[in-house]
Amino acid sequence: MGIEHELNILSAHRKPQAVAEYSQQAKSKGIEVIIAMAGGAAALPGTVAAWTEIPVIGVPLPTSEVKGIDALYAIVQMPPGIPVGCVGIGEWGARNAAYLAASIVGPQDEGVRDLYESYRKNLREN
């Protein structure tokens, strides 16, 4: 949709300090929503959410023998007080995470709102 974003590759298991630093600094960098994608134990979305108050959307990835079901359960079963929004598994989930992020940011950002509304209008008409 042409919305400004950044991409970071972080691991909650291999680089937990980097995840904590990124998550804690996100708000001061102007980041309004974090999309965290993870497979297997899928600790990344919950770890990010533990370190920031901005919305976190988790995307379970089909990286294991059970094709992402483990990641889905790990993301949706967060303890009270540390919420993570969760979308579907894999590519469709990743796409819906971006659309959900746009719908979260849109009410405060006219440019994002216009892009997202245009996208939705195009879906209805085509």
Predicted segment positions?
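Short, ordered loop/turn segments at secondary-structure junctions
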Residues: 10-12, 39-40, 61-64, 89-92
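Thiamine diphosphate
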Residues: 7-10, 20, 25
